[in-house]
Amino acid sequence: MAIIHPKVRGFICTTTHPKGCELNVRDQIEATRKLGVREDGPKKVLVIGASSGYGLAARITAAFGFKADTLGVFFEKPGTETKAGTAGWYNAAAFDKFAKAEGLYSKSINGDAFSDEARAKVIELIKNEMGGQVDLVIYSLASPVRKLPQTGEVIRSALKPIGQPYKSTAIDTNKDTIIEASIEPATEQEIADTVTVMGGQDWELWIDALNAAGVLAPQARTVAFSYIGSDITWPIYWHGALGKAKQDLDETAQRLAGKVGGSANVAVLKSVVTQASSAIPVMPLYLSMVFKIMQEKGVHEGTQDQLDRMFRDRMYRADGSPAELDEKGRLRLDDWELRDDVQGACKALWPQVTTENLFELTDYAGYKKQFLNLFGFERADVNYDEDVATEVKFDCVEL
């Protein structure tokens, strides 16, 4: 038991609130339920990277929107009797509790999703507990490091531009001030390493392993998540080291299309507040602006809204028609964010933002609240001065 308040260092909140995290998951489930349950979608789903952000949202949509049995893989720190674990641990525990209450199969694996050991365990569980095959594989890993399964070598990714230093207005999120951020360009080695960590190699290793074991259903589909953004963030993102990794993901999808019976696609999603996006310089300012503009235009979506739309309006359409894809074969869920009127308003606003008018011109207050929400804080229905149980156990295999 402990009384837990937020402690923020840089772009990480080092504390988490178990009750707040559970209520976050409950809210996401309720949002999905409101759209009604469909019987004509995925039935057995594997989510790699299932404990937060878009991966968690995909798992919720599959289970509570389509009654699917789900197996989730993630790397989180469990809470102990005296110390809170990571937010993802409590998210996964809450998902498991609600799914089981609904009579759905739910199992989780806590371990390194880049490892062969994780793949072997997943295959064993699919064979023994899920009827032998899965019909959807969601790949949603966002990690700064990857340990290569063959050699044990640890590779690190770099959030850097390519070619020249990147200078831009940004928010110092510790001081709530506008600063000029400058980031030196990535070396060739850093670019290659970023592709190794964040590109499609591991996604392909997963599909190859599942294929070899015969645990993919004849019409199995697989989707990996990506972000492209607009030219505001391109220097650090799409034209940076991370963009090279995401282009590798696109090429991987083309190859995987020949390896699965259904389809293999990259889904390009909108920018949302996640632990992953907070780490990208310039993103907090861009997010604060784009949220305000999209809310004003009535097209704002959260993480769960995006995945609900991806499943219902793209992948599993009620009329059975195939999803439209862009010229690279991608599912585009960033269509509303990239509308000319939205991006035009962002570009007009960008040079006007100062420390003095930051809270007035943008939804930075909303950004900060959503950031703390990720860790279970800033909820009106939680008393943060009360003791909360930090040790939460659930149906999870520890690797």
From Swiss-Prot:
It comes from Pseudomonas putida (strain W619). Pathway: Lipid metabolism; fatty acid biosynthesis. It is an enzyme of class 1 (oxidoreductase). Belongs to the TER reductase family. Its EC number is 1.3.1.9. The gene is fabV. It comes from the Bacteria. The record marks E76 as: Plays an important role in discriminating NADH against NADPH. Monomer. This is Enoyl-[acyl-carrier-protein] reductase [NADH]. The keyword Electron transport does not apply.
